[in-house]
Amino acid sequence: MQIILLDNVSNLGKLGEQVNVKAGYARNYLVPQGKAVPATRKNVEYFEKCRVELVAKLANIKSAAEARANKINELGSITILSKAGEEGKLFGSIGTRDIANAISMAGINTKKSEVRLPNGVLRTTGNHIVSIRIHSDISVAINVLVIAEK
């Protein structure tokens, strides 16, 4: 199925590109999410007229994401307290929700879906580098310090 992308979609294409995808992916995900429209003659003509507005909208979204990335960089690191055993192993684990909440408590709104844990959840005390993917093009690393609660 031929579609026109209304947004940058990772592993698929950028705004305005006509791409061929499976019908189910287009019908069930891209079109309902507002990321694409079917590539009919009418939609192609309409898109060419609205292209400037969509590019400006994406530029605004990206600039807002860059501003959030700068705030997170200024933050540098966050500290999370958790119950731990003698050898530094946590009772439980620290996941994406805990990290997102800690960043939000520091004054920067962050969703748990933006937090990337390359090695899985945090199960030990100490310093851990965590990636925050704010936008498809913008990713920021932050230091998470896990301290044992007394």
UniProtKB/Swiss-Prot annotation:
Give one GO biological process term: translation
Checking PROSITE patterns in the record gives:
RIBOSOMAL_L9
Example GO CC term: the record gives: ribosome
Name the source's superkingdom: Bacteria
Name the cystine pairs. Answer: none
- According to the UniProt entry, the coiled-coil residues are none
PANTHER family hit by this protein? 50S RIBOSOMAL PROTEIN L9
Q: What does this protein do?
A: Binds to the 23S rRNA.
Task: Write down what this protein is called.
Answer: Large ribosomal subunit protein bL9
